[in-house]
């Protein structure tokens, strides 16, 4: 009888420890799965923004516009 009580106590103690650790690591995993993609997006957005700024500078560069205009005018048929 004493042995059964000891096994029961050990089982419940093990169950509580495993259950608590599962909840703890589950919470850590949830937080990690939310934070890691957010951090990755943050760095990728900075790169995208810098590329977009560079493209806008190239778009509004006067020399670049004149080169584009010349290319388009050369494509037009002459009548």
Swiss-Prot record:
Mutagenesis / variant outcome for changing residue 32 to L: In ToAP2S1; loss of antifungal activity and increase in hemolytic activity against human erythrocytes
**Prosegment location in residue numbers:** 50-79
Compartmental location: Secreted; Target cell membrane
| BP term (GO), one | defense response to bacterium
Q: Name the organs or tissues of expression.
A: Expressed by the venom gland.
Give a yes or no for keyword Cell cycle in this entry.
no
Q: What is its main location?
A: secreted
Sorted keywords for this record are: Antibiotic, Antimicrobial, Chemotaxis, Cleavage on pair of basic residues, Fungicide, Immunity, Innate immunity, Membrane, Secreted, Signal, Target cell membrane, Target membrane
- A Gene Ontology cellular-component term: membrane
**Protein's UniProt keywords contain Protein biosynthesis:** no
Question: Which residues, if any, are the signal sequence?
Answer: 1-23
Source species, domain of life: Eukaryota
The UniProt function text for this chain reads:
Antimicrobial peptide. Shows antibacterial activity against all M.massiliense bacterial strains tested. Has antifungal activity against Candida spp. and two Cryptococcus neoformans strains with MICs values ranging from 6.25 to 200 uM. Also shows an inhibitory activity on C.albicans biofilms at high concentrations. Exhibits chemotactic activity for monocytes, neutrophils, and eosinophils. Shows low cytotoxic activity and has weak hemolytic activity on human erythrocytes. In vivo, treatment of infected mice with M.massiliense reduces the bacterial load in the liver, lung, and spleen.
What is stated as this protein's family in its record?
Answer: Belongs to the non-disulfide-bridged peptide (NDBP) superfamily. Medium-length antimicrobial peptide (group 3) family.
Output this protein's name.
Antimicrobial peptide ToAP2
Q: Which organism is it from?
A: Tityus obscurus
């Amino acid at each position: 009888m004493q042995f059964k009580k000891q096994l029961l106590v050990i089982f419940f103690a093990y169950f509580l420890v495993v259950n608590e650790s599962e909840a703890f690591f589950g919470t850590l995993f949830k937080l990690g799965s939310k934070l890691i993609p957010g951090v990755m997006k943050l760095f990728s957005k900075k790169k995208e923004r810098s590329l977009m700024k560079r493209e806008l500078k190239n778009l509004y560069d006067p020399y670049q516009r004149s080169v584009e205009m010349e290319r388009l005018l050369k494509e037009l048929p002459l009548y």
